[in-house]
């Protein structure tokens, strides 16, 4: 249904100087689904992910054409509030990157930046966010100890909690488990399945099995182009394009 489309991308082109990194991308991202972006290194999937919260704005020489509609509003229109966009679209990066602060201060950081000073409200947000990231029970007795003392998997869940603290509508994840061991990876994957009940999730992954396990839809990128996008089971069992089949069966990439 049209009303279920959270993000509508149309005719998106992105250039780094004279180099075209994304070529005429059009796709829909649906509410409360996990959309996986797959493809070999350098195919444009992470670049595309960063267009969804305008992170590419920070790179000198970037030029973007086309439109990205978030709930029907073009996020690239003139005078669009980028700060508000990044409040609605949280991001989790490849390697866990906790701030050199306590567990509590990591999660409370963004609400404070946005002007929240009430200690009781901050306490509520910290607990709610840590529970949302399935981390509360593991850290509730060490909230004021350095976040760097957590394991890698715990640090990544802390980064997810930090993203949840501003109550976003969309979560972008750029290979969130690539630096983690198998058990920590499994916990993050289970968490993603839980999170999609409340959030729309877009995840970049190099792991074909992971994309098959956790996503509802999969988009295959190659050389800056969107080759095809469909329900994940279709992409992995009956892809329309030979290049998609060659990639997911390991013939290249």
From Swiss-Prot:
Residues 7-248 form the ABC transporter domain. The keyword Manganese does not apply. SUPFAM superfamilies: P-loop containing nucleoside triphosphate hydrolases. GO terms for molecular function: ATP binding; ATP hydrolysis activity; ATPase-coupled phosphate ion transmembrane transporter activity. InterPro entries: AAA+_ATPase, ABC_transporter-like_ATP-bd, ABC_transporter-like_CS, P-loop_NTPase, PstB-like. ATP binds at residues 39-46. It is a peripheral membrane protein. Its EC number is 7.3.2.1. It is found in: Cell membrane. It catalyses: phosphate(out) + ATP + H2O = ADP + 2 phosphate(in) + H(+). Its main location: membrane. Keywords: ATP-binding, Cell membrane, Membrane, Nucleotide-binding, Phosphate transport, Translocase, Transport. GO terms for cellular component: plasma membrane. One of its GO terms (biological process) is phosphate ion transmembrane transport. Belongs to the ABC transporter superfamily. Phosphate importer (TC 3.A.1.7) family. The complex is composed of two ATP-binding proteins (PstB), two transmembrane proteins (PstC and PstA) and a solute-binding protein (PstS). Part of the ABC transporter complex PstSACB involved in phosphate import. Responsible for energy coupling to the transport system. This is Phosphate import ATP-binding protein PstB. It comes from Carboxydothermus hydrogenoformans (strain ATCC BAA-161 / DSM 6008 / Z-2901). The gene is pstB.
């Amino acid at each position: 249904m049209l009303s279920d489309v959270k993000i509508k991308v149309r005719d998106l082109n992105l250039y780094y100087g004279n180099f075209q990194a994304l070529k005429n991308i059009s796709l829909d991202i649906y509410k409360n689904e996990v959309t996986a972006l797959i493809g070999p290194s350098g195919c444009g999937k992470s670049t595309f992910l960063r267009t969804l919260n305008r992170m590419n704005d920070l790179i000198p020489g970037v030029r973007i054409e086309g439109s990205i509609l978030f709930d029907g509003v073009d996020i690239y229109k003139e005078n669009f509030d980028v700060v508000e966009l990044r409040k609605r679209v949280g991001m989790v990066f490849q390697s866990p990157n906790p701030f050199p602060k306590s567990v509590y201060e990591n999660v409370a950081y963004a609400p404070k930046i946005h002007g929240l000073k009430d200690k009781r409200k901050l306490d509520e947000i910290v607990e709610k966010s840590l529970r949302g990231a399935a981390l509360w029970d593991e850290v509730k007795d060490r909230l004021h100890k350095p976040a760097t003392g957590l394991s890698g998997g715990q640090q990544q869940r802390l980064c997810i909690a930090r993203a949840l603290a501003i109550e976003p509508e969309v979560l972008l994840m750029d290979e969130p488990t690539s630096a983690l061991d198998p058990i920590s990876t499994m916990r993050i994957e289970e968490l993603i399945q839980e999170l999609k009940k409340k959030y729309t999730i877009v995840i970049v992954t190099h792991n074909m099995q992971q994309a098959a396990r956790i996503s509802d839809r999969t988009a295959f990128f190659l050389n800056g182009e969107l080759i095809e996008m469909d329900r994940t089971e279709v992409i992995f069992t009956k892809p329309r394009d030979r290049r998609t089949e060659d990639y997911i069966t390991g013939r290249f990439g």
